[in-house]
């Protein structure tokens, strides 16, 4: 079991597959190209679902690409050593995934016309999902209990740091024309409507049948059965108890796990940390 994180600029990263030199190069040297598309999220926000939807939009619903190429090759995580080397050598438009907070992301992006989609999810559900997910990997120290992980999460002592700072940082770009903010809860409630919104943002015109195919092949069940998307190909030495990337994918699962005291404590921290945002911006509030 990894005893600790790999810290960089005050942010905890997994102890393997993440290198300080690469993180520095991403921020200072990596050039985001105009034709690139960025998928930005805090971990456990529905990243893989969004990647699957975007990939299917690009193929107009044809599932061949998503069923033959692993998800981390279709849209590599730039902050991993493998992802970074794949991206710097890739020609043409690139799909780029990242969990990096805004202050660690490539400086070149902020003066480019590249489009980015930022996906936000209720942090309470992220906390519960993260607890069950990370506890089954060898990538981080095991909290042992949800109560311990709860405390870590509120303090930002979890992978990729504070959810509150991550979301505050990236949402500062929400008025930019090349930046689309999506909410996991909205995708769950109206998947087809969200797919159309992404198509509009990307300038893609899909017919009704093509939209239905995107919907079909990006469903929870379809992704769960797709070995290119469910992370079943991941190395066994990084997994302890049979990693399940796709556990539930539901909204409000935190209510099954938080105590009343935890729910109240979380509400208090949320109100403090997210003060200043317009009322109603978060669909779960």
Swiss-Prot record:
| Gene designation | Sult2a1
What the protein does comes down to:
Sulfotransferase that utilizes 3'-phospho-5'-adenylyl sulfate (PAPS) as sulfonate donor to catalyze the sulfonation of steroids and bile acids in the liver and adrenal glands. Mediates the sulfation of a wide range of steroids and sterols, including pregnenolone, androsterone, DHEA, bile acids, cholesterol and as well many xenobiotics that contain alcohol and phenol functional groups. Sulfonation increases the water solubility of most compounds, and therefore their renal excretion, but it can also result in bioactivation to form active metabolites.
Q: Where is the active site?
A: 99
Q: Might you give the EC number(s) for this enzyme?
A: 2.8.2.2, 2.8.2.14
Q: Please provide, alphabetically and separated by semicolons, the GO molecular function terms listed in this UniProt record.
A: 3'-phosphoadenosine 5'-phosphosulfate binding; alcohol sulfotransferase activity; bile-salt sulfotransferase activity; steroid sulfotransferase activity; sulfotransferase activity
- What's one GO-annotated cellular component? cytoplasm
**Which species is the source of this protein?**
Mus musculus
Protein name as catalogued: Sulfotransferase 2A1
Tell me the domain of life: Eukaryota
């Amino acid at each position: 079991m990894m005893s600790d994180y790999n810290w960089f600029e005050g942010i905890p990263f997994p102890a393997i597959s993440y290198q300080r030199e690469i993180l520095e190069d991403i921020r200072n040297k990596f050039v985001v190209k105009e034709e690139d598309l960025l998928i930005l999220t805090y971990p456990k926000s529905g990243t893989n679902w969004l990647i699957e939807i975007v990939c299917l939009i690009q193929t107009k619903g044809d599932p061949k690409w998503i069923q033959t190429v692993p998800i981390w090759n279709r849209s590599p995580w730039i902050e991993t050593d493998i992802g970074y080397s794949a991206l710097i050598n890739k020609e043409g438009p690139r799909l780029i995934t990242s969990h990096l907070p805004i202050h660690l992301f490539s400086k070149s992006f902020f003066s480019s016309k590249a489009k980015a989609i930022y996906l936000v999810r209720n942090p309470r559900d992220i906390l519960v999902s993260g607890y069950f997910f990370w506890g089954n990997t060898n990538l981080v120290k095991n909290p042992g209990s949800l109560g311990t992980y709860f405390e870590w999460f509120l303090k930002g002592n979890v992978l990729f740091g504070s959810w509150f700072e991550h979301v505050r940082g990236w949402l500062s770009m929400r008025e930019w024309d090349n930046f689309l903010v999506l909410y996991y809860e909205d995708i769950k409630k109206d998947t087809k409507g969200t797919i159309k919104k992404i198509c509009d943002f990307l300038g893609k015109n899909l017919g009704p049948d093509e939209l239905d195919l995107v919907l079909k092949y990006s469903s929870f069940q379809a992704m769960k059965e797709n070995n290119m998307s469910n992370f079943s190909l991941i190395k066994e030495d990084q997994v302890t108890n049979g990693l399940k990337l796709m556990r539930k994918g539901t909204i409000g699962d935190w209510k099954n796990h938080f105590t009343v005291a935890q729910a109240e404590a979380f509400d208090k921290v949320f109100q403090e940390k997210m003060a200043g945002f317009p009322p109603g911006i978060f669909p779960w509030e």
